[in-house]
């Protein structure tokens, strides 16, 4: 593929394999918790052995949700084990919404990222790619683009049918979506009138820990993209919160309406309760080394380390794994639950032969088409004048371009008939999905992902592929959690993924050619992929060099019904074949449903936390105790 200077910059930005040392251009708008919290020995026990009711491994979105819910009962003791600490101690890049997209270009302080790389990827021309995975309280809710939405009714119906449990239908999980939420409407004095979202108040939640709102700044480019989507007949829907995705909407974000900061799980679920609950203990900067089992395959606790000190945390009721789609299967395997042949090769004592652990990995990828535009975008933040103005506006009023993560408007759609030159295998793959499952999420993307520093503004329309059929896996290379897992997502190795992605690039071009954009916003010709990239092979080559993982690893400890050979957990998150061990993160997803997954992550955590409470009160039953696969 012929490469323009812009394409070269885009390639280097979106496929970075290392992380930057820091973020140089941030407004120094810090809110550290202070020594009264960070050094409190009762809330931060250090490397001290302790016995509690529940040990929760992983302090991300799911883990902090589970820990907060379990510790609502003052008679129940909960320990959280998290390898990272408070991101506010390191940088404000996870505080200011306008810096969210910079994580896509590698502006990740190394203290906050695990530094994982994939195996060489055939779908990326054999390259090794960095895989962002948060090492901080809040997990990926401290790194992501902050979008919150639910999924489709049909997707959850498919989930419920495949796990043989109607409690997973959309109607039955709606209360768990809403339970977390504290929705606040827009500030009309800060957000433009022509970007007022339409949202049914009954579709959101109020009074929960997790703040969701619309940013105080609407991107000008997004207002024009909305007009283009209107021109092609994409109808408005209410915030992607009703179980219906097809259509366009302004996107809800996890932002605190009062201070304008990112509302991560650390800020919303943990920080308000950490001082007030004497039954909650945070082991930050502490690595879970392995799950401990007795001779009866009952999880009894976790071996952990802080620095060079190794110690045990004992769980009298359950161990709950919430380390995410990459590290939960890694932890299971180093603990002896996995493929027996691999475990024996690595001299790990086999607790349970479970070869499905780490398999069935799904992920979302994204890619886009870029233009120079005649409106302000986040690319202006490269220059001192606009940057200083943005800093002042955010610090003084939590307004302006830094109050928004950037990608604030999008639409879910299928590829239109004139572009559907798909193979029989692709048609067969799509036929297995519910009718309300869109093929792509097309997003206004007015943020800097390697744009030239030439004084102009640039933007993209990006597609996140909603129908990933490529399947990867997570494995281990040693018996130690200190070593990186084997990460092989196998992106773009499915024929259907390639064909739909190529068609999606062509569909983005159609959107950008709508008169309302061409006449009012776009300046000059397409800069990436570039007008010379036209054939299927040329677009495919562009995709291989420029797609980006959304870092949504899921399904690696898949949920299923009794007798499902691919299932690791039952519909209540209980690990088959062992006792007192549950998983409550994205690794248990039956599949990666349409929509962006943050809302589903919180929902799953809320639901499984409720299941834990119910089982402890009424008895667990036998579903999670199956010992053969």
Swiss-Prot record:
Cofactors that this protein relies on: FAD
Per its UniProt entry, which superkingdom is the organism in? Eukaryota
Q: Can you tell me which residues form the catalytic site?
A: 552
Q: Which keywords label this protein?
A: FAD, Flavoprotein, Glycoprotein, Oxidoreductase, Signal
State the EC number(s): 1.1.-.-
- What GO terms describe the biological role, i.e. biological process, of this protein? secondary metabolite biosynthetic process
Q: Name one Pfam family in it.
A: GMC_oxred_C
Keyword Glycoprotein on entry? yes
Enumerate the InterPro entries for this protein.
FAD/NAD-bd_sf, GMC_OxRdtase, GMC_OxRdtase_N, GMC_OxRtase_C
User: Which GO molecular function, any one, fits this protein according to its record?
Assistant: flavin adenine dinucleotide binding
Signal sequence: where? Answer: 1-22
Please tell me whether the keyword Magnesium is annotated for this protein: no
Give me the glycosylation sites of this protein: 92, 172, 182, 256, 284, 312, 421
The record lists FAD as bound by 61-62, 82-83, 144-147, 586, 597-598
Q: Which family does it belong to?
A: Belongs to the GMC oxidoreductase family.
- Function text: The subsequent chain release by Dieckmann condensation (DKC) could be catalyzed by the TE domain present at the C-terminus of pyvA and/or the alpha/beta hydrolase pyvD, installing the tetramic acid moiety.
Q: How does the record describe its quaternary structure?
A: Homodimer.
Q: What is the protein name stated in its UniProt record?
A: Dehydrogenase pyvF
Species, as recorded: Aspergillus violaceofuscus (strain CBS 115571)
Q: Which gene encodes it?
A: pyvF
């Amino acid at each position: 593929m012929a490469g323009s200077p812009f394409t070269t910059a885009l390639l280097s930005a979106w496929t970075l394999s290392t992380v930057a040392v820091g973020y140089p251009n941030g407004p120094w708008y810090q809110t550290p918790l202070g020594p009264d919290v960070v050094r409190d020995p009762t809330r931060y026990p250090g490397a001290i052995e302790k016995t509690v009711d529940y040990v929760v491994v992983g302090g991300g979105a799911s883990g902090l949700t589970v820990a907060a819910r379990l510790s609502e009962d003052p008679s129940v003791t909960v320990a959280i084990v998290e390898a990272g600490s408070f991101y506010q101690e390191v940088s404000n890049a996870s505080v200011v919404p306008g810096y969210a997209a910079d994580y896509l270009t590698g502006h990740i302080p190394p203290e906050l990222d695990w530094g994982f790389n994939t195996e060489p990827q055939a779908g990326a021309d054999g390259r090794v790619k960095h895989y962002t995975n948060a090492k901080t309280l809040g997990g990926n809710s401290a790194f992501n683009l902050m979008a919150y939405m639910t999924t489709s009714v049909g997707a959850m119906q498919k989930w419920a049918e495949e796990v043989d449990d109607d409690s997973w239908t959309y109607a039955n999980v709606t209360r768990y979506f809403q339970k977390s939420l504290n929705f606040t409407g827009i500030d009309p004095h800060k957000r433009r009138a022509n970007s007022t979202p339409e949202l049914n108040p009954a579709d959101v939640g109020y009074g929960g820990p997790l703040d969701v709102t619309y940013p105080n700044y609407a991107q000008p480019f997004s207002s024009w993209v909305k007009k283009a989507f209107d021109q092609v007949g994409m109808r408005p829907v209410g915030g992607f919160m009703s179980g219906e995705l097809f259509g366009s909407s302004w996107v809800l974000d996890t932002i605190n309406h009062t201070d304008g900061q990112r509302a991560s799980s650390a800020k919303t679920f943990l920080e308000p309760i950490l001082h007030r609950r004497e039954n909650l203990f945070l082991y930050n900067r502490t690595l879970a080394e392995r799950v401990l089992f007795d001779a009866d395959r009952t999880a009894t606790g976790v071996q952990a380390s802080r620095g060079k000190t190794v110690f045990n945390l004992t769980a009298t009721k359950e161990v709950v794994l919430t380390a995410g789609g990459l590290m939960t299967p890694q932890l299971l395997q180093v603990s002896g639950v996995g493929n027996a042949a691999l475990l024996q090769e690595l001299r790990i004592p086999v607790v349970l032969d479970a070869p499905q652990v780490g398999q069935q990995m799904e992920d979302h990828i994204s890619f886009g088409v870029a233009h120079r535009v005649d409106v302000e975008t986040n690319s202006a933040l490269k220059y001192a004048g606009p940057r200083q103005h943005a800093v002042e506006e955010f610090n003084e009023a939590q307004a302006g371009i830094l109050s928004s993560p950037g990608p604030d408007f999008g639409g879910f759609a299928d590829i239109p008939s004139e572009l559907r030159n798909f193979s029989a295998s692709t048609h067969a793959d799509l036929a297995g999905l519910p009718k309300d499952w869109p093929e792509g999420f097309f997003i206004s993307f007015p943020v800097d992902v390697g744009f030239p520093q030439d004084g102009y503004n640039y933007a993209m329309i990006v597609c996140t592929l909603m129908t990933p059929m490529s399947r990867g896996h997570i494995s281990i290379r040693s018996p130690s959690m200190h070593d990186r897992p084997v990460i092989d997502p196998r992106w773009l190795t499915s024929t259907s993924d390639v064909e739909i992605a190529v068609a999606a690039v062509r569909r983005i071009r159609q959107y950008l050619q709508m008169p309302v954009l061409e006449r009012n916003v776009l300046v000059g010709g397409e800069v990436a992929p570039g007008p010379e990239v036209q054939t299927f092979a040329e677009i495919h080559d562009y995709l291989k060099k420029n797609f980006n993982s959304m870092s949504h690893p899921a399904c690696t400890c898949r949920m299923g019904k009794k007798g499902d050979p691919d299932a690791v957990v039952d519909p209540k998150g209980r690990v088959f074949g062992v006792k007192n061990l549950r998983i409550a993160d994205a690794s248990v997803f039956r599949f990666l449903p349409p929509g962006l997954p943050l809302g589903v992550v919180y929902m799953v955590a809320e639901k499984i936390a409720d299941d834990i409470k119910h089982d402890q009160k009424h008895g667990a039953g036998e579903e999670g105790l199956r010992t053969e696969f």
